[in-house]
Amino acid sequence: MAVERTLSIIKPDAVAKNIIGEIYNRFEKAGLKIVAARMVHLSREQAEGFYAVHKERPFFNDLVGFMISGPVMVQVLEGENAIVKNREIMGATNPAEAAAGTLRHDYAETIDANAVHGSDAPETAKQEIEFFFKADELCSR
């Protein structure tokens, strides 16, 4: 099994609910290590840049508006199969379809305000991590 890194974002809805620690606890119980973290209030330009892949999608403007509505917690998770493991912890994008015990089932309200973001593949994980962190800001443990 490969040790990987993945980007995770705790979105404005979950930050506002004051559940960052509960989410971090889930990551750590699953064997993932937090190797970088910061809280940031994204600008419109940052959010548009991060979600540029969705620019032509009908939900793009709503997504950007939501992501700039309050601070987010951005972290890099490291561990065996971190990308898949994080996506399993998150659950389905639509909280109504998310399995019991997943972050989105437990903490998300809607498909838009769905608590967390996670990279979906090694290539996107690398790009997303580099969007938020310099190499010397990642602290392997």
UniProtKB/Swiss-Prot annotation:
Its EC number is 2.7.4.6. The active site is at residue 117. One of its GO terms (molecular function) is metal ion binding. ATP binds at residues 11, 59, 87, 93, 104, 114. Its main location: cytoplasm. HAMAP family: NDP_kinase. This is Nucleoside diphosphate kinase. It comes from Alkalilimnicola ehrlichii (strain ATCC BAA-1101 / DSM 17681 / MLHE-1). The lineage of its organism: Bacteria, Pseudomonadati, Pseudomonadota, Gammaproteobacteria, Chromatiales.
